[in-house]
Amino acid sequence: MNKDELRILQVGDVLVSPNIITEKFCCDLDACKGECCIEGDAGAPVSLDEIMEIENMLDVVWEDLSASAQAVIDKQGVAYTDIEGDLVTSIVNGKDCVFTCYQDLKDMNDGHTIQNCCLCALERAYREGKSKFMKPISCALYPIRAKHFGNGVYGLNYNQWKICKAAVKKGEELNLPVYKFLEGPLVKRF
């Protein structure tokens, strides 16, 4: 079947955009250095439960946050309602998520160092065993965006963003569909 002929798929109460099945994707931190956490006009979508989890671990990650991020959190909290009416993580200077932090990172495949990579302070605390909460599920699912339509029905769309061109190329090289790349977070959420 031609991928242009595919229509929205329904899996239980989840409507799945066909390009989640047909398109390829694999994050390439060498190329983007975590740019999805520092670009955009709003923070990552969060639930009230996630906001509580984040607030409970602020003491754990506080020193990893920039002074600007700390000031934003002191002023408005860890989240706000964006122009579309969604709860999202707070951002610094209209773009950077308040939970971004930077460090050199060893590539898991060949061990080379990726310099000055943007990471999530929440996820780093989780990986260091300091927290049971990893990060908002919307971050773990990226580049898939989930939308709740009500009555338990969700829609999943593949968000194609120019900063992820290298991830698309790497996914094509590995022949790795979006849904396979995100299998863990998809299973956890749905």
Question: What is each stretch, according to the model?
Answer:
Residues 1-190:
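Short loop/turn segments that flank or connect secondary-structure elements
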